[in-house]
Swiss-Prot record:
Cellular localisation: Dynein axonemal particle
Gene Ontology cellular-component annotations: dynein axonemal particle; RPAP3/R2TP/prefoldin-like complex
Annotated gene: DNAAF10
InterPro entries for this protein: WD40/YVTN_repeat-like_dom_sf, WD40_repeat_dom_sf, WD40_rpt
Alphabetical GO biological process terms: apoptotic process; axonemal dynein complex assembly
Function noted in UniProt: Key assembly factor specifically required for the stability of axonemal dynein heavy chains in cytoplasm.
GO MF term list: ubiquitin binding
WD repeat residue numbers: 63-105, 115-154, 162-205, 207-249, 257-297, 319-357
Keywords per UniProt: Apoptosis, Cytoplasm, Repeat, WD repeat
Coiled-coil intervals, chain numbering: none
Protein known as: Dynein axonemal assembly factor 10
The organism of origin for this protein: Bos taurus
Organism superkingdom: Eukaryota
Amino acid sequence: MSAFEKPQIISHIQKSLSYTVFDCKWMPCSAKFVTMGNFARGTGVIQLYEIQQGDLKLLREIEKAKPIKCGTFGATSLQQRYLATGDFAGNLHIWNLEAPEVPVYSVKGHKEIINTIDGVGGLGIGEGAPEIVTGSRDGTVKVWDPRQKDDPVANMEPVQGENKRDCWTVAFGNAYNQEERVVCAGYDNGDIKLFDLRNMSLRWETNIKNGVCSLEFDRKDISMNKLVATSLEGKFHVFDMRTQHPTKGFASVSEKAHKSTVWQVRHLPQNREVFLTAGGAGSLHLWKYEYPIQRSKKDSEGVEMGVAGSVSLLQNVTLSTQPVSSLDWSPDKRGLCICSSFDQMVRVLIVTKLHKI
């Protein structure tokens, strides 16, 4: 691919914020997005922005008692577009951004900070009930149904006497029918655990040697296809989730991408083979996954095992001197993307020529 044909990553709008921003998410079916974080005075903040004529207009600012670490629209309907958030005190709240004074759902989900959140079953993505998963420093991963008060529908925690590991990232997947659904969780010691929610079992686990910062399936609402895991020390791994070997697990390929921590991975909603990683040195890398000629082969005993593909770098850009801590593609407009970084900036990016890859 020549330099002229390659996608370009263009910083379209930059906005400096007056607080530390931890997460940003597009509001579905709109040119709006939310940013979440904490003010220096120790309170939490949610801001709603809209893109208007090449600039950002602040539509709403909501201040809450506790700093807000993460949020998702993944379990809401397209009509309501409620935002679910996790905060520093372990609370899970669901907000109607039109009337945000009181949450529409509230539960003290964890004993410590909720580091990570994901949703499925809303927005027309994933079969089955809407659910939210949260992961916390208290070592537990909990699945919540917004229609059920107080208690999680599933609770994955270490057994008595086992060390509690800090859970840094969670992701839903495999939600291709009413029954099937998995949650993948990544921990500070490099553990990755795949929980099967249908029969409430640990389906697979592995360790990638470095703390797992971000996990994402290429699609939540299909039979598991690929999983990307990013980590400290600048590495990420792509697992082929189609074929699970009884002892070797899933085949994977790893890539040393950034000079420092890879904070985030996000797959392009319009093409699941393309994904963006965000690094600790303020850089973004755009990748494409290439499948092998055959995705599975038989081992010496005739048991099916997966074959990993390869990853190629399409483009990279440095936006900031500080880590890019969150990243979100627009579900509606191909190539439109937002990211936030620890220099208290939110950026709207345009990635060009994505239809040509």
